[in-house]
């Protein structure tokens, strides 16, 4: 029996549309610490990107217009993104600040949430919302 997905690949991976793939790579790398696993180019520009976090494939994306698509990033289409990504990280406050430094907009400043996690939220330059969370250190 064959394994239906590549090793170290989740069963579900978001595939986003971004305005500029090179800019998105820089944002996700510098804001969240993601790494590039695969990058396909056309005429010197990335048209398909796969990014990892903590050793797992986290997301894939293509720029607007790639492969003949008419899809737009939320910021490019002028609408509020209906989904929210929930990213666990080692230090919410630091990742939140890195995201702001890279051009994200604050949705919610870091705080101790009622459900027991340290939590913050940002909107990335393409309009996607990211919740940043970590569990409190145990004494």
Residue ranges with predicted function:
Residues 18-20:
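Conserved beta-strand-loop-alpha-helix junction that forms the acyl-donor binding cleft
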Residues 1-15, 25-90, 94-123, 133-139:
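Vicinal oxygen chelate
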Residues 126:
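C-terminal catalytic core of tyrosine-transesterase DNA break-rejoin enzymes
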């Amino acid at each position: 029996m064959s394994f239906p997905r590549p090793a170290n690949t989740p069963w579900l991976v978001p595939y986003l549309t971004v305005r500029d793939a090179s800019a998105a790579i820089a944002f996700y790398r510098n804001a969240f610490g993601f790494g590039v696993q695969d990058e396909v180019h056309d005429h010197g520009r990335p048209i398909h990107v796969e990014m990892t976090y903590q050793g797992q494939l986290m997301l894939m994306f293509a720029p607007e217009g790639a492969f003949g698509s008419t899809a737009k990033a939320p910021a490019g289409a002028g609408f509020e993104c209906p989904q929210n990504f929930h990213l666990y990280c080692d230090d919410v406050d630091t990742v939140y600040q890195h995201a702001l430094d890279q051009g994200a907009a604050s949705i919610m400043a870091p705080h101790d949430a009622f459900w027991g996690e340290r939590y913050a939220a940002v909107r990335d330059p393409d309009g996607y919302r990211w919740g940043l969370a970590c569990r409190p250190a145990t004494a």
